[in-house]
C-alpha cells in the first residue's frame, strides 16, 4: 500500500527524465541553444566535433540534451545517439535558403530510422531575428512536415541569442512527453 502511494506521488509530483537528441546542419545554432537553455546566456561557440551534453531542468522534467555536430562529414555519426531517444530537436537556420533542401533530406533520412519511430519531433526555426529569415510556415512546407504520418511534431520559431521561442518548444515537449 505504501509503495503504491509513493508511486502515485512520484507520478504526480516527481521529476521525469527525457533524453533529447538535438541535431541539424552545421551553423544552425544548436550549441548556442543548448547553452542558452542551460546557463541563460550566450556563449562563444566553435563548430562541434563530436557532441555536447547537458541537463536542462524545466517543469519537473530533466531533459538530457545531446547536441551533436552537424558538419556533413560527421552526420553519419548521428545514428549512434538514436537509442533511447524520446525527443528530437531539429534545428534549422531560417536564414539559410540555400541549404533548406539539404536539411529536409537529413531530417527525412533520420526519421526513417526504426530506433526513432516513437520519438517526438520539435523543429526549431532558428535565427528569426535575421531580416530574410523564412517563417515557420515556410520551413514547415520546405521540410515536408505536413506529410509526416504517425509522428507527433511541432515547429517553433526561435532566436537562440535572445532566447525567444526556446521555452515554448520545451513546453510542447514536456506536455507531449506526459501524454506518451
UniProtKB/Swiss-Prot annotation:
Subcellular location: Golgi apparatus
UniProt cross-references to InterPro entries, sorted A to Z: Arf1-5-like, P-loop_NTPase, Small_GTP-bd, Small_GTPase_ARF, Small_GTPase_ARF/SAR
Keywords per UniProt: ER-Golgi transport, Golgi apparatus, GTP-binding, Hydrolase, Lipoprotein, Myristate, Nucleotide-binding, Protein transport, Transport
GO molecular function (one): GTPase activity
Reactions listed under catalytic activity: GTP + H2O = GDP + phosphate + H(+)
Gene name for this UniProt entry: arf1
Protein task: GTP-binding protein involved in protein trafficking; may modulate vesicle budding and uncoating within the Golgi apparatus.
EC number: 3.6.5.2
Pfam families: Arf (PF00025)
Primary location group: Golgi
Gene3D superfamilies per the UniProt record, alphabetical: P-loop containing nucleotide triphosphate hydrolases
UniProt binding sites for GTP: 24-31, 67-71, 126-129
GO cellular component terms listed in the entry, alphabetical order: cytoplasm; Golgi apparatus; plasma membrane
Swiss-Prot/TrEMBL GO biological process terms: endoplasmic reticulum to Golgi vesicle-mediated transport; intracellular protein transport; vesicle-mediated transport
Lipidation (N-myristoyl glycine): 2
Protein name: ADP-ribosylation factor 1
Family: Belongs to the small GTPase superfamily. Arf family.
Organism of origin: Schizosaccharomyces pombe (strain 972 / ATCC 24843) (Fission yeast)
Amino acid at each position: 500500500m505504501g509503495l503504491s502511494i509513493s508511486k502515485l506521488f512520484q507520478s504526480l509530483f516527481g521529476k521525469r527524465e527525457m533524453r533529447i537528441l538535438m541535431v541539424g546542419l552545421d551553423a544552425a545554432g544548436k550549441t548556442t541553444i543548448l547553452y542558452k537553455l542551460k546557463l541563460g546566456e550566450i556563449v562563444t561557440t566553435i563548430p562541434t566535433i563530436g557532441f555536447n551534453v547537458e541537463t536542462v531542468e524545466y517543469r519537473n522534467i530533466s531533459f538530457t540534451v545531446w547536441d551533436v555536430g552537424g558538419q556533413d562529414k560527421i552526420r553519419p555519426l548521428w545514428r549512434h545517439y538514436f537509442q533511447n531517444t524520446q525527443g528530437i530537436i531539429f534545428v534549422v537556420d531560417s536564414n539559410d535558403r540555400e541549404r533548406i533542401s539539404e536539411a529536409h533530406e537529413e531530417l527525412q533520412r533520420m526519421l526513417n530510422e526504426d530506433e526513432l519511430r516513437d520519438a517526438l519531433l520539435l523543429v526549431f526555426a532558428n535565427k528569426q531575428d535575421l531580416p530574410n529569415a523564412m517563417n515557420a510556415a515556410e520551413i514547415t512546407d520546405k521540410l515536408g512536415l505536413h506529410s509526416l504520418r504517425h509522428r507527433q511534431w511541432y515547429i517553433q520559431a526561435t532566436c537562440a541569442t535572445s532566447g525567444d521561442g526556446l521555452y515554448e518548444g520545451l513546453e510542447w515537449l514536456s506536455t507531449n512527453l506526459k501524454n506518451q
